[in-house]
């Protein structure tokens, strides 16, 4: 059963009861997943940006947006408009497919994995996760990468509090650390 179908049929009714909500539309849901990769070396090394864009496109199955510097910072040796990273925003079916792959395939492949931190919520039910290496995703072949780079994954939910957000992600199967 896909994550989207499981959310509709089992997770939504369970959260409605557990969070003691009255309306099905009050139940928190995932709105979007944003994957971001900041590349400091992109200012000097154009190949690293190309490789990153290709990797994120492979992981997400969607076109990647190159992020550019808003203003010049001499200390970082960047000028306004220089490419400094890349990002992808996933919604709908691609979002659920990515979350399913992240939870069931990618996270368990992290070395010495003991669960993700439960403290990475922002106060409004959104969760951000930092991944140190892209090779945890099955789409990326270790032989074809030029360098190991990480990325930030932000899961934006309609939850009103961190507790609601955590309940939603726990039901979806996110492996939180037990402190």
UniProtKB/Swiss-Prot annotation:
Any one GO molecular-function label of the UniProt entry: rRNA binding
Gene3D superfamilies: 3.30.1440.10
SUPFAM superfamilies xref list: RL5-like (SSF55282)
Disulfide bridge partners, by residue number: none
Keyword annotations: Ribonucleoprotein, Ribosomal protein, RNA-binding, rRNA-binding, tRNA-binding
One CC-aspect GO term: ribonucleoprotein complex
InterPro entries cross-referenced by the UniProt entry: Ribosomal_uL5, Ribosomal_uL5_bac-type, Ribosomal_uL5_C, Ribosomal_uL5_CS, Ribosomal_uL5_dom_sf, Ribosomal_uL5_N
Functional summary from the UniProt entry: This is one of the proteins that bind and probably mediate the attachment of the 5S RNA into the large ribosomal subunit, where it forms part of the central protuberance. In the 70S ribosome it contacts protein S13 of the 30S subunit (bridge B1b), connecting the 2 subunits; this bridge is implicated in subunit movement. Contacts the P site tRNA; the 5S rRNA and some of its associated proteins might help stabilize positioning of ribosome-bound tRNAs.
Entry-linked HAMAP family: Ribosomal_uL5_B
PANTHER family (alphabetical): 60S RIBOSOMAL PROTEIN L11-RELATED
Record protein name field: Large ribosomal subunit protein uL5
Organism: Synechococcus sp. (strain CC9902)
Gene: rplE
């Amino acid at each position: 059963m896909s994550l989207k179908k499981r959310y509709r049929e089992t997770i939504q009714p369970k959260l409605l009861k557990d969070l003691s909500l009255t309306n099905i539309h009050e139940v928190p849901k995932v709105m979007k997943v944003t994957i971001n990769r900041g590349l400091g070396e992109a200012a000097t090394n154009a190949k690293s940006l190309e490789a990153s864009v290709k990797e994120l496109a492979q992981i997400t199955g969607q076109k990647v947006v190159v992020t550019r510097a808003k203003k010049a910072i001499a200390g970082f040796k960047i000028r306004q408009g220089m490419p400094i990273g890349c990002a992808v925003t996933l919604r709908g079916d691609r979002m659920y497919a990515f979350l399913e792959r992240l939870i069931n395939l990618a996270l368990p492949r992290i070395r010495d994995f003991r669960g993700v931190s439960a403290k990475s919520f922002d106060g409004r039910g959104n969760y951000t996760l930092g991944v140190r290496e892209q090779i945890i995703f099955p789409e990326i072949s270790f032989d074809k990468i030029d360098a190991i780079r990480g990325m930030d994954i932000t899961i934006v939910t309609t939850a009103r509090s961190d507790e609601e957000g955590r309940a939603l992600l726990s039901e979806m199967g996110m492996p939180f650390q037990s402190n």
